[in-house]
Amino acid sequence: MILNKALMLGALALTTVMSPCGGEDIVADHVASYGVNLYQSYGPSGQYTHEFDGDEQFYVDLGRKETVWCLPVLRQFRFDPQFALTNIAVLKHNLNSLIKRSNSTAATNEVPEVTVFSKSPVTLGQPNILICLVDNIFPPVVNITWLSNGHSVTEGVSETSFLSKSDHSFFKISYLTLLPSAEESYDCKVEHWGLDKPLLKHWEPEIPAPMSELTETVVCALGLSVGLVGIVVGTVFIIRGLRSVGASRHQGPL
């Protein structure tokens, strides 16, 4: 992946809903990022999103000039995509001005961190979703692809926009729907300027190893032993109970 290293970030507007504390002890109950604007010279491309507590609420498809809501429940709301298009146009103008005035120093490429896990506990043959979390992304230019047994997978794949972090880096999540099988393994392939070569994060379903014949024999023997002990103990208690009843009858009334 040959990528141009010229990059410029747009303004990041954050609105924070704070808990009613004061001074240095203020802790955020919820954090909303309204109008996360990103424009870069690579591509060139831009991004406009709204986020709440780290989740993407919607983004504006700049090519189709429409708002895309990430959850069906949010589609009752409206957002004029023209607002985002205007913001991106302003960022593009500012970027061009800054490039002319700068010495074109490249941004520092951070090394992304990749984690792969399943959405729910894995049962072979039952639908599930693999999640590839790519964290610490900067600059926000990355390729994320899925491989199954070494072959590229395109069906059932979706991903988020670049989601902002407080340290001004980004993270991105890619999803893969699948039917887990003992014959298939998966890799999340990540390409980024901060990596010397593409990074592959491997995942395969964990299948409990079958018990050996010796283990099965030991388990059966232990179960049989416990059962026999229970029978013997129960018999002893029954005999003692019968003897106690017989003794009380022979004593008769005082």
From Swiss-Prot:
Residues 120-203 are annotated as: Alpha-2. Keywords: Adaptive immunity, Cell membrane, Disulfide bond, Endoplasmic reticulum, Endosome, Glycoprotein, Golgi apparatus, Immunity, Lysosome, Membrane, MHC II, Signal, Transmembrane, Transmembrane helix. GO terms for cellular component: clathrin-coated endocytic vesicle membrane; endocytic vesicle membrane; ER to Golgi transport vesicle membrane; Golgi membrane; late endosome membrane; lumenal side of endoplasmic reticulum membrane; lysosomal membrane; membrane. Changing residue 124 to V: In allele DQA1*05:06. Changing residue 237 to L: In allele DQA1*02:01, allele DQA1*03:01, allele DQA1*03:02 and allele DQA1*03:03. GO terms for molecular function: MHC class II protein complex binding; MHC class II receptor activity; peptide antigen binding. PANTHER family: HLA CLASS II HISTOCOMPATIBILITY ANTIGEN, DQ ALPHA 1 CHAIN, MHC CLASS II-RELATED. This is HLA class II histocompatibility antigen, DQ alpha 1 chain. The lineage of its organism: Eukaryota, Metazoa, Chordata, Craniata, Vertebrata. Changing residue 160 to I: In allele DQA1*04:02. InterPro entries: Ig-like_dom, Ig-like_dom_sf, Ig-like_fold, Ig/MHC_CS, Ig_C1-set, MHC/Immunoglobulin, MHC_I/II-like_Ag-recog, MHC_II_a/b_N. Changing residue 88 to M: In allele DQA1*01:01, allele DQA1*01:02, allele DQA1*01:03, allele DQA1*01:04, allele DQA1*01:05, allele DQA1*01:06 and allele DQA1*01:07. Changing residue 74 to F: In allele DQA1*01:01, allele DQA1*01:02, allele DQA1*01:03, allele DQA1*01:04, allele DQA1*01:05, allele DQA1*01:06, allele DQA1*01:07, allele DQA1*02:01, allele DQA1*03:01, allele DQA1*03:02 and allele DQA1*03:03. Changing residue 64 to K: In allele DQA1*01:03. Changing residue 183 to D: In allele DQA1*01:01, allele DQA1*01:02, allele DQA1*01:03, allele DQA1*01:04, allele DQA1*01:05, allele DQA1*01:07, allele DQA1*02:01, allele DQA1*03:01, allele DQA1*03:02, allele DQA1*03:03, allele DQA1*04:01, allele DQA1*04:02, allele DQA1*04:04, allele DQA1*06:01 and allele DQA1*06:02. Residues 1-23 form the signal peptide. The chain crosses the membrane at residues 217-239. It is found in: Cell membrane; Endoplasmic reticulum membrane; Golgi apparatus, trans-Golgi network membrane; Endosome membrane.
